[in-house]
Amino acid sequence: IRYKGDQEIGAVSWARLRQFADGRREIERPRYEGDRQGRPFVVTADRGVLQAPGAGTDPNQLPEETRLVGHVEFREQNGMTILAQEATFHESSGTLDVPGPVTFSDGKVSGGGVGALYDRQLQVLTLRDQSRVTMAPGAGGGGGFTGTSKTMLVNRQTHFLQMDGGATIVRERETLAADNTQVRLTDANDGVTLMQLRGH
């Protein structure tokens, strides 16, 4: 358990723990629960590999970094879900670093790519390669789109998408292509208020 003053901000549980002489630990079915800035979240996986802070450390003391393997799921109470097969969770900053394929969903917005970093404090997801995003159509059947680019930044606080490198947007009646595309979403993330395309 980790505290900030008298307030509990994180706890970890597992089904089985093995500890080695070099301080390395392996845990089965790890579950990390945190609550920072009033935004509860949960991280789970099939297995976790971590390094103890020091010799003789209490097994319940949370490490700074945990490598997660198998069915990694990062879920925030306010809507963001990230799925991967491998990731590294940094406890103190609440960031999730994914080296391989990843998918995400946040209300009507979903997508994925290869390689990603999610910063909980900034509420920003960065997709590093083969990025894609989909907005589901509204109640009337309009307003939806799909987009692809090399890299993509999804800023949940400002409701903003930045697509860089061969950006393509496909809407109901048109396909748009540019080097870079910026998309501004509604506050509810259920529609587009502005779209800017730059370059060929």
Question: Each PLM stretch: what is its role?
Answer:
Residues 1-200:
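Mature-chain termini and adjacent capping regions
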